[in-house]
Structure formats: structure tokens, C-alpha cells
Amino acid sequence: MAKRNVKGLYYITHVNNLHSILQYGILSHQQVEKQNIPYTHIYNPEIVANREARKTSDGYSLWAYANVYFQPRNPMLYKVISETDKNEVVIVGISPQALDIKDAFISLGNAASPLSPILEVDKGLELITGEYWSIINSDWWKTEDGTKRKIMAECLVPNVIPPRYIHSIYVTNQTTADKIRPILNNFTLPVAIVVEPHMFFQPRKHGPITHQLFWVDGDMFFSQMQTLTISVNTVGVMGKGLASRAKYQFPDMYVVYQDVCRAKTLKIGKPHLYKRETSLDEDLADVPSSLPNLNANKWFLLFPTKEHWKQKSDIGGIERGLQWVVNNYETEGIQSLAVPALGCGLGGLNWKDIGPMMCRYLSGLDIQVAIYLPQEQEIDPEFLTRKFLLGE
């Protein structure tokens, strides 16, 4: 059965609700009110109200169903941790056996949206593990192609998902794990506490190099830095790696990139800064209009590491590009900067060579700079030290 591909279901909630969830299970909104259970809300009232109006084929409102996600790292979680201290948010891991609960449904996307079909479980699973699978397992989404809605696909269970289906609690850091451990000690069934910062859009690991410069193991496209650096060639092709993701996630940036390549103004040693005028929250958060403060506009630094996409990265050209950053970041208005390990991965360069060179230049900037480690290489901790990277 297709269900074998579904490793778990997930419920996003406030840490204050854990005690009642472990006691009563994950309740529908209707049951929370009916049983008068104290509950700390993390969802916008407008979102909750929208769900009341939509009904399943059984004639019941979505309020009558406990709803869990197939993918918790989604626009709703992004919105929640934009409004709530991430240390107060937990994700409850549910066994996929909950899909067998009688009269459950699957919504192919955010169930509140009329664009999301609500289907019986067998048909819904066939689609979730088929054409929707790559969307469910994606690291990003867009409004235009529907992936922002579809990645929030839900399993809808009448009234309650009993506590026996709970197998894990995911948290963003060890502090939250320590906070909830006493709660779980009183729960008779075994439940694992899993520290998984990536699930909460946080770096897996990070460490200081100087007071302004640090290395990060994580997803650069969720960085809080104002400007994101994209490694590119100068012939207008974004085929693989970070550039390929940027091309599809930010098509307006790709248009600008092609324009500067055609105009031959993008050259080795001369990056191009695209000052985008759209907040990343608008792209990533569910119902971004209700966020109290949208984050600042995200800029892109198109940084050539080679001339042709078939070539290996040009370390001399990268060094000239870094010098350009040093000379121009203040006048261009760059306030903080995220940079991948330039030329590593598909470019063929090694962190042992490029890391120290990047740090020599970027450590002199009077702004915060995050260097994102190459995902294609395992970096030994000794090559992440200040002594190795700066010779100090």
C-alpha cells in the first residue's frame, strides 16, 4: 500500500499544550471547545475561522477534525515561528497508522483552501505518494505554481487522534528539549524527543570565526541575512546546485541574471547586486498579510565563479570578486551577507583552499557575514577553526 512511503504525520503546537495532548490526544477545534480544555493558540484567528466554513463530503466542518500535516516544514510553520518564539513551538510526530482511523480524509493541500480536494484516504494516499510526493518533500515552495498550498497537505481525523499514536516530539534546540522532558516523564508510552533545528528553518550547526563572521551548516535560502549570494557563471545558465534552486524559487532574479549576462555586465571579478523589493515572508509564510512585521526585502548578489558552466571554478576570479565585495559593500548598501562556499561542490574547489581565502576578505567587513558550508563535502572540525581559517 502507498502508506509505506509515509513515515509520519505532524502536528504543530505550542509547548504549553503538550500536557493535555499527551493526556487526551490531538483534539479537533470543536472538541477542545466542547471539553473546555485550556489551549494556547499559535494560529491566527482568521485562519481558524476560515476552516469552520469548509466541510468534508460527510457534511462536517473542518473544525470537527484533528488535522495533521504530511510535511511540517511548511508555510504554516514558517508563519508560526515568525510570530511566536521558536523555543515555544513543538512538532508532535504521529504514527502513519493514524491514517487507518475510521472516517479520516486527506486534503491535497491546505484544507481551508477551496483549491485543495478533500478525498477518502485510499485515493488521497495514492496522489500524496505519487504526483504530490516531490512537493511534499521539497525544501521550498511558491504561490504561483500551487506548491505553497500543496505542501500543506493534511490528514483529517474525526474528533481525536489518541495519544497512543504519538511517537516523537520535535524541538528546535536542547533548551526546549530539557524543558519538555519532565512532561514526557509522566507519560506512560515511549515518546522520543528529537532536536531537529532544520525542521524549524534553523541552521543544523553554526560557529563563530570572528565577532561578525561565522560559518553555518544549513539552508542559505532561509538565512536572516539581508543579501544572499548566488554562485553563477557568466553565460546565463543556472542548471544545477544552489543556482538551479534560486532560478525556480526566485524567477525574477533569474530574469535579471539573464539580462546582465546578455549585456555582458556580469564578469569574473565583478558581481551584480539585484536589490529585490519583495519581502521573503511574502513568499514563504502562509497568509503573510496577517504578519505584524514582514521581514526586510531580500537582495541577491550574483557572484561569478566561472565563465562557462562546463568549466571548473576559477579561484583567481573568485578572489577578485571577493575584493569587489570588500570595496563596494558599503556604497551598495549591503547590511548583512550570506555566502555559500564559493566554487565548492559542483565547481570542484576544496573548502581547505577556498575557506581561508573567503575568511581573509570577509572578516574585514563591518557587517554580519554567514558562510554556508558546502553540502557536498564533509568538513572536519579542525578546518572550521579561527586558527585554520584566519591563521590566528
Report residues per predicted region.
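Active-site-proximal loop/hinge segments that shape catalytic or ion-binding/gating pockets
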Residues: 2-67, 73-211
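Short, hydrophobic, well-ordered secondary-structure elements
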Residues: 66-70, 232-235
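Macrodomain-like recognition of ADP-ribose-binding/processing modules
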Residues: 2, 89, 186-392
